[in-house]
Amino acid sequence: MATEKRSNDLPKAKKPIGKGRTARATNKPVALPANNPTNGKTPAATAKPAKTTSNAKGQLRIRFQLRYRTSFGQTLFITGNHPQLGKGSADQALAMKYFNEESWYAEIDIDTASPAFTYNYLLKSADGSFTTDWGRDKTIDPTTITGKDLLVLDAWNYAGYFENAFYTEPFEQVLLHQRKAAKAISRKTTTHTFHVKAPLLQPHESLCLLGSDALLHDWDTTQPILMEPGAVNGHWSIAFNLNKAQFPIAYKYGIAETATGKFIRFEDGNNRVLYDAVAKDKQTIINDGFAVLPNTSWRGAGIAIPVFSIRTAKGFGVGEFADIPVLVDWAKHVGLKLVQILPVNDTTATHTWMDSYPYAAISAFALHPIYLNLEQVAGKQHKKAYDKLAAQQTALNALDAVDYEAVMKAKLDFVKKIFASEKTVLSSDDFKTYYAQNKHWLLPYAAFCYLRDEYGTCDFNQWPAYRHFNLADIEALAAETSAAYDAIAIHFFIQYHLHLQLQQAVAYAHANGIILKGDIPIGIYRYSVDAWQQPELYHMEYQAGAPPDDFAVKGQNWGFPTYNWAKMQEDGFAWWKQRFEQMRYYFDAFRIDHILGFFRIWSIPMHAVEGIMGHFVPALPVHINEFNSRGIYFDYHRYTQPFINDQVLWDVFGYDNETAKQYLDYNAFGQYSLKPEFATQRQVENHFAGVEQNDVNAKIKQGLFDLISNVLLFEAKDGKAQQFHFRFGMEGTLSFRYLDDGVKNQLKDLYVDYFFRRQDDFWQQQALQKLPALKRVTNMLICGEDLGLVPACVPDVMRDLGLLSLEIQRMPKDPKRTFFHPNDAPYLSVVTPSTHDMSTIRGWWEEDRSKTQEFYNKELGQWGEAPYYCEGWINKAIVIQHLYSPAMWSIFQLQDILGMSDALRRQDPNAERINVPANPKHYWRYRMHLSVEQLMQEKAFNDEFAGYVKASGR
């Protein structure tokens, strides 16, 4: 199994983020010549500190020394929550001084009674950008230091080190063996304290230390010095009195058996070396970062399923939070360690099935009422009322798919019925605590729901007295003395019970060694609480979407407003930080939907309907001079307006071209333009919404859409006819077809430069302004959905930040490959054969016979003609391929797991698909075709699958 290559060598800066150099690994300690501190391949753990003068009584002088090899133009700073370190502000951080090519240092004098503080190092590059070393474990408590001088020798923690993933909450709290911390180290009689991290030791193993001095047992592996586990899992420490030691000292960490002390192995890489000078009233802390040990040995498997898709025997026609524990029981039985779900935020905008789309939340914080378990809310007091729903519950639960409207109506009607007698819970201390912690979103959300129903629309622009959010007005509306109080407070009630039920499900999962992975949508619904509260945070004049691809040839228009990142940055991304904190209530890990949106977002003007009319924002436009410099005569009208002549009309409409001309004006030279009242796709859509719906009108409507998008360039905002963005897929337009070949070639070169070269550094800078700050807010494990048209800078940024990528076999990121093999996945990644936006393995198998045949022969290594249907053994082979991937996580849709069994799987694979991205009006209603309880009874299948999981090392 591959291991991330690291050594004890100094980290060297790499723009934009520094990472360690690779060194030859060795388990054998290297002998250290007594008087040769710079010998050969033995790197200095620290440069020899300069002499310090005695400090005042009651004062502690701290000298920070960081091992880091900078490049020209780079400088280092210390930032922390102490006043002398800038109180966490990068602008006020303490500048470090260059000591030699291998280290930087800084000094501060503080009161010995000062409270403990945390700190990190900042690297400032020549371009002014900052990179912060990772982690939250650099802490100093002055009250524990007995001397007057403290030397702190630190190692830079590159965010992309694999080990950092094991210090996120899911690993610290659930997935890794928890050790009992040793007593705090006493420094009264010690001079040097060594700290190091090793997260993946086995339960019977401990970290140990040996070195070149007699006090470190002279490399004697029969006498390893066992270290003590720290308060944080995977942290190890040991303290020595090295007053009589002979410096420099070479040393290494290793592994030994805890019970017997038997030495097992040394860490990889070269010796660590400590250069120090003993002095009176001085203590030294050595923070060595990570022990250089295998760091890719932990791998897990999980299941991905929307909550609404979970079917249980006692369900109400839809999966609920209360059903998650039932699924957890099955997942544990087969050896899975993760349950991944889709967004569970409230999407109730219209009270119709259109609200089934889980990525169009009316609140980025509120939970969806559809996941409420009525039996738990009813309790004993309302059991009779609940029992009256039995017939309706049975009927809904028997359905193949979710009846969204019927389920929602039944649940809301029942809650309204019992609310009057149950609302006393709102006076409880527990609710008051919950309300105080969540008021910032809960109060506006509840008022929003009331006003939505009162006015019959969630478009707050149509609420005369409340179109602009005003907190004082909302507090008055929601006051207990208000006539609207009950209609508002019922939403407090629902949210509180949803909160309790989801937390209970999470606690059950954790108790069974399973983590819950959530999903953060990239956008917000246009008429949402968030847009109502803070419209300045969004570009309401744009719609977010995605450019055309094989799955949506016209692109995707999600309808969400795009983010005003500049405005969000003014308060340090406070809204995003609140959003991440809310996720932390319930989830251990989360998937950032469309992480590419943090680099740039596909922005579509409001006058457009199809995604193909968009362009990336931000993006560096093409200046008119660039056309001229390439010898392209710039014809503004020809390039930026729809190109329409008789041949184009025939190509688009065929024999209906004469019918289409009623929407056009004839111009000179055999060309046409759209009439002013049909100049935009939105105008065309509105017109055809009021005419007879038939095939001819549908064809004309789509044809007019195609004419409107038949352009080569879009003028940039405020471009003043000087700056332009290329229309995506320019070569496929009819406008391009009828250009001269010479112009075509020149435009193609400029097009390639625009999309695939000039933007990379710019987009990287955009992402680095956002993602590091947001990642630092939470200690959850973060995965990015990095699919689609991926800029070249994305993999580097995600790797440097330690964000897990998503790797899909049939969607290779290398355009030269037809398929991606799971065995080629990076360690920090999630591999999966399909997602909710795709057909399942079985569905895909039947879509394109030529691709299926190629996959069958090349990826599965089979001879002959591929079976027409994806037989169970084929599905099984694909699942096993993914289980044996080196990726940290292998996650499967339940449909793909069941697809391994010819007996258990659904007959029609197309009925298993959750979403069709090309259809903006898709009904999200997929349900399991058998209950989880039934699945639990399939012993042979479960044992077989569990065997594959175990054999793969997951």
List the model feature ranges, each with a label:
Residues 3-56:
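Intrinsically disordered, polybasic Lys/Arg-rich low-complexity tracts
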Residues 11-21, 39, 48, 58-61, ...:
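Eukaryotic low-complexity, Ser/Thr/Pro- and acidic-rich intrinsically disordered regulatory regions
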Residues 21, 39-41, 51, 165-193, ...:
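Catalytic cores of glycan-processing enzymes that make or break glycosidic bonds
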Residues 58, 72, 90, 188, ...:
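A short, polar/charged loop/turn motif at coil->beta-strand junctions and beta-hairpin connectors
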Residues 60-66, 191-198:
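A short, amphipathic beta-strand motif
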Residues 65, 79, 97, 122, ...:
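Residues in well-ordered beta-strands of folded domains
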Residues 69-114, 124-145, 200-248, 256-278, ...:
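Aromatic-rich carbohydrate-binding modules that target alpha-glucans
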